[in-house]
Regions:
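A glycine- and small-aliphatic-rich helix-loop capping segment at beta-alpha/alpha-beta transitions
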Residues: 21-29, 93-105, 121-127, 158-164, ...
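Internal gly/pro-rich beta-alpha loop/helix module
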Residues: 107-178
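Accessory alpha-helical/coil subdomains and C-terminal extensions
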Residues: 2, 8-12, 28-38, 152-231, ...
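Structural motif
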Residues: 77-78, 228
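ATP/nucleoside-binding phosphotransfer catalytic cores, i.e., glycine-rich phosphate-binding loops
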Residues: 241-320
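Short Gly/Thr/Asp-enriched flexible loops that form oxyanion-binding sites at enzyme active sites
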Residues: 84-103, 239-248
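ATP/NTP phosphate-donor binding region
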Residues: 1-70, 245, 265, 288
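Short beta-strand segments
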Residues: 8-10, 81-83, 106-109, 143-147, ...
Length: 320
């Protein structure tokens, strides 16, 4: 029996073409729909679910993808989602926090549009189909497949504006490799809390620490509509003292604050006890989010709030 793979196209560079001027534009006719499938034992059913450049993707689109996957789970052996690369890691992480069915779910994209020299779209697409049809991928969580590498949704991030090897996993490295004849996995996905959301809403912005930062940036936020805040802090998790004071005032208003490091590698942890240091921030109630970048920490907090987590339960989830 061939493996039946559901392909959900959502737009992005992989579906686009460069025009005569060299500008990459959206195409109404997705070139991936015309790719002949040379892979034996794989039956592809493709659907143009969205046709959006990935900067237009919102959590509501991510949730719609989750609901579609749940709806079709009994009809397929795996899922491939083609997606623009700018926010691909966020959609992958969002899906990875949902109660996804036990099947391979793979996101892929392209750094070069379909008619550019050296286009990587078709190769990445076929690689994703290979992984989605592999039974060993079913217990790895949501995966990102690009440039012969397999990455865990939780850790992967886009690291280069144009290079085809843009997707990397800082600190941990890739979860597996795609070889000519086989697929090699180095690691298994870790167990985690998953949610089954029907709706998602809320305002959780991200601010980044910088030298000379004061409390003015936080003062610009509309606190009456603020559901939470993510801070990209210095180093192991430190901010200027003026910023720390303002964060404490948010916490006193029961507005949760999550902290990550702005460093590319490493993990945020409370080390320094000076004013604005991580020790003081954690004592005040700031959540130290391990191993996630700011954009994923934002989704984590947004999902937790929509799931109704509060108090110690919210802290345990955010810091777990």
């Amino acid at each position: 029996m061939p493996k039946k793979i559901l392909v959900l196209h959502t737009g992005g560079t992989i579906s686009m073409q460069a025009d005569a001027s060299g500008a990459v534009v959206t195409s109404q006719d997705n070139p991936m729909n015309h790719v002949s499938n040379p892979l034996e034992g794989i039956e592809v059913h493709a659907l143009d679910f969205f046709n959006l450049p990935s900067p237009h993707i919102k959590p509501k689109h991510m949730l719609a993808l989750y609901h579609k996957i749940k709806e079709e789970a009994n009809n397929y052996d795996g899922v491939v989602i083609t997606h623009g690369t700018d926010t691909l890691e966020e959609t992958a992480y969002f899906l990875d926090t949902m109660e996804i069915p036990h099947m391979p779910i793979v996101l892929t994209g392209a750094m070069r549009s379909s008619n550019e020299l050296g286009s990587d779209g078709v190769y990445n697409y076929l690689s994703a189909l290979r992984v989605a049809s592999d039974d060993k991928a079913a217990d790895k969580g949501v995966l990102v497949v690009m440039n012969d590498e397999i990455h865990a949704a939780k850790y992967v991030t886009k690291t280069h504006t144009t290079n085809v090897g843009t997707f990397q996993t800082p600190t941990h490295g890739p979860l597996g490799l795609i070889m000519k004849q086989e697929i090699l996995y180095f690691k298994t996905a870790e167990p985690r809390v998953r949610f089954d959301l029907e709706h998602i809403q809320g305002l959780v912005p991200i601010i980044s620490a910088y030298a000379g930062m004061t409390d003015e940036l936080i003062d610009m936020l509309d606190l009456d509509h603020l559901d939470g805040l993510v801070v990209q802090a210095f180093g192991a998790g430190n901010v200027p003292k003026e910023t720390a004071q303002k964060l404490e005032s948010l916490l006193q208003k029961d507005i949760p604050v999550a902290l990550v490091s702005r460093c590319f590698n490493g993990i945020a942890e409370p080390v320094y006890a000076y004013q604005g240091g991580g020790v003081q921030l954690q004592r005040a109630g700031v959540f130290f989010v391990k191993e996630l970048n700011a954009q994923k920490a934002r989704l984590k907090l947004l999902i937790a709030l929509n799931a109704g987590l509060k108090g110690q339960e919210l802290r345990n989830y955010m810091e777990g």
